[in-house]
Amino acid sequence: HRFGFVNGGANEFFGLDGATIRLGLDYGVTDRLMIGAGRSSFQKTVDGFAKYKFLKQCDAGCTMPVTLALVASTSLTTLKKEQLPWYDPANVDYFSHRLGYSFQVIVGRKFSDRFTVQLNPGVVHRNLVTTVDDPNDVVHISGGARMKLSKRVAINGEYFHVLRDQLPINYRNSLSVGFDIETGGHVFQLHFTNSTAMYERGFITETVGDWTN
């Protein structure tokens, strides 16, 4: 679940009325390959991904200091054509217009049992953009970190920095911070973010929330 913006006030029950849901299933095919798919209520979007780990960081006694993986994903909005943000009755609604793709290289390092950092540069390709001046390919340099505060509690964060002059001025970079709380066989996650979407094309190129507002 991802709730709405807190600054909606009591009228929006401080974000609870604007909840967005994504139901997903991930499957580890091997110890290096993972695939997954999901469906979000935001713009009624279906998404899928594949992640392959090329290198794995090892303990003392070997020479591999980082973990290296490649993630490729795609998303498809299933909104009725009249509901599409770019809908124009004068234009044809091509199926390809609804698709977007994302590719990321993830470089991670576990410095200790408590502290992990990752850097994940990548590109998002949008088949359809709003104006002819908007690029179809959006390049970003992003990263995240995780710190264990105790045996069962960890704090983590991630930031997606889109390079300049690629998005309209009303869009923002995605910033998220949160906590992981382990309780037996479950991990509860409480995150705060300025992004509504839970798929790459959405939260990297379509974030409108502002942390300062």
What is the predicted function of each stretch?
Residues 1-104, 108-127, 138, 147-154, ...:
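Transmembrane beta-barrel domains of Gram-negative outer membranes and organellar outer membranes
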Residues 131-137:
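Short helix-loop boundary/capping segments
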